A protein has these predicted regions:
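Short beta-strand->loop
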Residues: 73-83, 136-142, 180-200
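A ligand-binding cleft/hinge motif common to bilobed small-molecule-binding domains
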Residues: 57-71, 127-128, 157-189
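Bilobed "Venus flytrap"/periplasmic-binding protein-like clamshell domains
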Residues: 3-29, 38, 61, 85-159, ...
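Hydrophobic residues within well-ordered alpha-helices
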Residues: 48-49, 103, 163-164
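An extracytoplasmic/periplasmic, membrane-proximal ligand-sensing/linker region
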Residues: 1-8, 13-18, 201, 208, ...
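Glycine/small-residue-rich loop that forms an oxyanion/phosphate-binding "nest" at active or ligand-binding sites
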Residues: 65-97
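N-terminal low-complexity or amphipathic/hydrophobic leaders
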Residues: 42-66
Length: 275
């Protein structure tokens, strides 16, 4: 495997720690990578398209951005087990609403403007269930960490707390976040309920330039697949990155973000032009 430059967005301070550990892991397995850090996903995809990096650890929206900009020529690598088969939950106060249609004319909270799981996919989900964006409900956005595509969870959590406090009637959050907030007491399971769930979708994935050879991508993936959660050193990396196993990437899981982008009039192109 040739030396690969791999982009990563610093959505939290631990990102640099994670990639220091991953870089050492590759060295121990006879390969060399160089982590290149970015402050947001637009700059990361810019670098990928310009050939300044070979790969990017991308959000669903950033993967779609790369796919559209490369006219479908981008390649993909592995993802985390926790990236597969995610859902977003529509959450309300317990007993307040019975159906999605009951939210017509109400105020719905969303995460940051560019969050796939807490805004874009939810808006398309509401559209598919008869509620049109900009017409059938008032949207209240919690723009925390714009440019990070919702990875920081901030706006998503703020929207949830606004729902709990009665500032909005409903909110959306990733299934894993909902479970974590119920578990740690951030939200009271006796006060809230899941009104509806989206279909499954996939989250982050490694995106490669069209010029990166299939052999190098396979070598990159094969080394990542060697991480073993039962090994204490590997477990440290995997716990920080939120997984128990690296698995092959796949394209089918990005249909919902693609549909959301189209519903909002090529959101990512307009969004990038304003950054």
């Amino acid at each position: 495997m040739k030396k690969l430059k791999v982009g990563a967005v610093i959505y939290a301070p631990r990102v640099t720690v994670i990639w220091d550990l991953i870089t050492k892991f590759y060295e121990e397995n006879g390969a060399e990578i160089e982590a290149v850090f970015f402050k947001d996903y637009k700059l990361q995809v810019d670098a990928l398209m310009n050939g300044e990096i070979d790969a990017a650890w991308n959000s669903p929206l950033a993967q779609l951005d790369a796919h559209l900009r490369s006219e479908g020529k981008e390649k993909i690598g592995c993802m985390r087990d926790t990236d597969r088969d995610r859902k977003t939950y529509l959450v309300v106060k317990k007993g307040k609403f019975e159906n999605i249609s009951d939210l017509k004319g109400k105020t719905i909270g969303f995460g940051a403007i560019d969050s796939p799981q807490a805004r874009l996919i939810p808006i398309n989900f509401l559209h598919n269930n008869g509620l049109e964006f900009g017409k059938d409900y008032t949207d209240k956005r919690f723009d925390i960490g714009v440019g990070l595509h919702g990875d920081h969870v901030g706006g998503e959590k703020d929207s949830m707390m606004a729902m709990v406090n009665g500032e909005v009637d409903a909110t959306f959050c990733l299934d894993l976040n909902y479970d974590a907030w119920i578990s740690d007491g951030t939200i009271d399971k006796n006060e809230v309920e899941v009104l509806a769930k989206t279909d499954y979708f996939d989250h982050c994935v490694f995106t490669f330039t069209p010029e990166t050879s299939d052999e190098d991508i396979k070598a990159f993936d094969d080394i990542m697949f060697k991480m073993d959660y039962n090994n204490e050193r590997d477990k440290e990396i995997m716990d920080l990155e939120g997984l128990k196993q690296w698995v092959p990437g796949r394209r089918d899981g990005f249909k919902q973000i693609t549909a959301a982008n189209e519903y909002l009039g090529n959101f990512i192109k307009e969004y990038n032009s304003e950054q």
